[in-house]
Amino acid sequence: MKFKIIRLKDNSISEKHANECVAQAKTFGIDVDYFDAIHGSEYLNHLDKLKILPKYKFKKNRIGVYGCFLSHYYLWKQCVEDNIPYTILEHDGYFINPMPNNVLDNFTDVLKLDNLDPYSKNYNEEIDSASLNKINYINYNNPKPKNSFDKLGVSKHGTGNYLRGAYGYIIKPHAAKKIIDWIAINGFVPADQQIGNSIVDIQVTIPTVVRLHPAYFGQINKLSLTGNPELL
């Protein structure tokens, strides 16, 4: 298995937190390789190169959303080409537990490494009480699929119940190909919304292995590079 962290080079926020994640991973014997993120300002060139289109128009000036998606997309392609599972981290991911033994035997397609809602006011308390004395794997249930389903319960994005944050997950090659093939037909949506259970099976670990970086707690919207073009 390969470990990759998406880092926006020459961006102080991204580099600082990515470096902290890599250093923390080493304390658990995990070597994480950097992946230089695609800058959102270059998204048109990459869409032309990849021959893919968005499923719908993204919010104005949200170039960070394009850059984030493209970074994940290129890693999905690498995962397929290498034909080995990838652990994909964003710069705001942070290891708090070692990778469980035989982890690859315990999920089918995608494993989210945090079963908690990073937007919850109780996130830190729930994380602090976690223990790796016993590891469980359960089907993923988006804790707050706000505005993602219509009144009949149909996914507006077409991807189903998707990840609430893509800061730490493992994906197997056949699952990455499922996502790539879906995009070729339907177009793409933001990276975390792209990984949905209408496309791939999703399990989560209990307790958490990779959490949202502590610096982001309560400040996700303020520090997010996807939501704040001025930070890019």
Regions found by a protein language model. Name each.
Residues 1-89, 93-232:
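An acidic/histidine-cluster motif and surrounding catalytic segment
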